[in-house]
Amino acid sequence: MENIADLWNSALTELEKKVSKPSYETWLKSTKAHALKKDTLTIIAPNEFARDWLESHYSELISETIYDITGAKLNIRFIIPQSQTEEEVDYPPAKAKKMNDESNHLPQSMLNPKYTFDTFVIGSGNRFAHAASLAVAEAPAKAYNPLFIYGGVGLGKTHLMHAIGHYVIEHNPNAKVVYLSSEKFTNEFINSIRDNKAVDFRNKYRNVDVLLIDDIQFLAGKEQTQEEFFHTFNALHEESKQIVISSDRPPKEIPTLEDRLRSRFEWGLITDITPPDLETRIAILRKKAKAEGLDIPNEVMIYIANQIDSNIRELEGALIRVVAYSSLINKDINADLAAEALKDIIPNSKPKIISIYDIQKAVGDVYQVKLEDFKAKKRTKSVAFPRQIAMYLSRELTDSSLPKIGEEFGGRDHTTVIHAHEKISRLLKTDTQLQKQIEEINDILK
């Protein structure tokens, strides 16, 4: 039982990285391992509602996570405390998907059926990434190759990658589509060397029509894996096969990434996804509620959207937490109940959200620069230096991408923003006067 407990604790550690904080704390944190018999792992859920939700929403993810840890394909069964002694037949386990499927595309467990273009909510922060993804899906290797999508956690990068895979398979069932994380690519590569199966590994990933690889930033520092992926990339690109890559940052900001690999990522199109605005967050909640068959008052969705502005995963997790809380205490959902359900994950006083406009105004006040001059083409020192400071602070104090910052400064290139950030960072190490001026600007922004 101790080994089972260790296995489940390891699984929970990995699952915590894959789901939102509200989802993890609501559904997974309170679960415990009960038994491992033959090919079935039995997990204890705290109540019947949680058991049913875990069964329908997390079985496949848990099975895949266990497989990544152990290499074993286990079925997952959920029980509630009073049913621990019941026969297996009462609640049949969720069948694990076959990981060695020999069909042209991966098993459905690897492409989430919920992640399609139809279920993707388009907003100002993801409109271009969505359009680029759809173009790639409609004409693989002809529109943008590679397509590099970057942005923060839980903003929809993985959703778009799965959507591309689904679209390609739907319109060409014979297409060989592979989706995986860079971590899985690394693990399989290491295992192939250990087991003397490097040729099989290369054949697997160099003979596909579409390669979708998630979280490429985790290749940083892994020299041998980068070497292998470099040759995989070349082989696919030379054969006009589509490559789609996601990361939490643009190629130029991935540390210890080989220059030759970075340059190849820049061959095609690089597009970012930024956090959704209020209208998009409300639309996301409405679509989620409809998909799950939930009747949620509009005031509750507006309340949640105003409180959770970090990413989509946290947003949807908060909605499900409210629904679960309502079910457990048997009360109707309203704004007060939502506030009670989310009190542990919403800070009492949310920090002020600083915009690029706020920064430009504050820097302008300190350096006597007009707002319009930040976007103008003026290069006089009296304007150029404050502009660089404003770019530096925009990078430090906002979640805006490099292209977005450049756009707010008169459509300047993202490399200009990088240069400004590097220059001010360097000066701050020795220039005490600049340190005081930055401190003054920060005081204004508080």
From Swiss-Prot:
Q: Which residues cross the membrane?
A: none
Matching entries from Pfam families are given as: Bac_DnaA, Bac_DnaA_C, DnaA_N
Give the residue ranges for region: Domain II: 81-109
Q: Which UniProt keywords apply?
A: ATP-binding, Cytoplasm, DNA replication, DNA-binding, Lipid-binding, Nucleotide-binding
Gene Ontology molecular function, alphabetical: ATP binding; ATP hydrolysis activity; DNA replication origin binding; lipid binding
- Which residues are involved in binding ATP? G154, G156, K157, T158
Comment on protein domains: Domain I is involved in oligomerization and binding regulators, domain II is flexibile and of varying length in different bacteria, domain III forms the AAA+ region, while domain IV binds dsDNA.
Checking PANTHER family in the record gives: CHROMOSOMAL REPLICATION INITIATOR PROTEIN DNAA
How is the quaternary structure described?
Answer: Oligomerizes as a right-handed, spiral filament on DNA at oriC.
* Protein name, entry field: Chromosomal replication initiator protein DnaA
Question: Which species is this record about?
Answer: Bacillus cytotoxicus (strain DSM 22905 / CIP 110041 / 391-98 / NVH 391-98)
